[in-house]
Amino acid sequence: IVAIAQGGNGVFPFLNLPTGARQAAFGGSNITLYDNDLNFAFANPALLSEKTHNFLGLNYTNQFNDVNIGSAIYGRNFSDKDFMAFGIHYVDYGTFLETNEIDQTLGTFTAKDMAITAMYCRWLSPRWTMGVTMKPIFSFYERYSSSGLGFDLGFSYHNEKALFAAGLVLRNVGFQFNGYNSINGDNKQEILPIDLQ
């Protein structure tokens, strides 16, 4: 009897983690909040605006078992209609003890995930914006590594007088450059965790 288990909905699932405290408090992925909190641009690049100019967002969380999650983002406007931001999002899973099948210690190893982001947003009208994110992705688990490239495409509608906002975003469209090598040397490439919100 052969048993095979498959879990998850794509490689690099850390891309779906919230990057800031407010984002986590709003359920993890709010794509409509149009204010000066630059961290929401990680979820929807169309949320960049004149309000995020020269803002810096720094976030760090120490989870259980020394799992560290962090992000940094900086916003810059290049005109009254063109907004950009650059950021990094990482997860450090800590140091693990490597043992063999009879519990002899062989050493230690680490595991880390990271995405570097470049975001651009264009003001289409007084109420509509469109944004795109490009994110090279890197992952290192013990001696296995993988890299990829992901893109997000987002739209935002905001009417401050009516106190109404809406968003639409397609996240994590892309591919792996190289997959994690298996024990027999296969290099299987997997899909990214594509998400339409």
Task: Name every feature range the model reports, one short phrase each.
Residues 58-61:
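Short beta-strand segments that buttress and anchor functional surface loops
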Residues 63-65:
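A short, glycine/small-residue-rich beta-strand->loop->alpha-helix junction that serves as a flexible
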Residues 4-27, 31-37, 53, 69-197:
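Outer-membrane beta-barrel porins/channels
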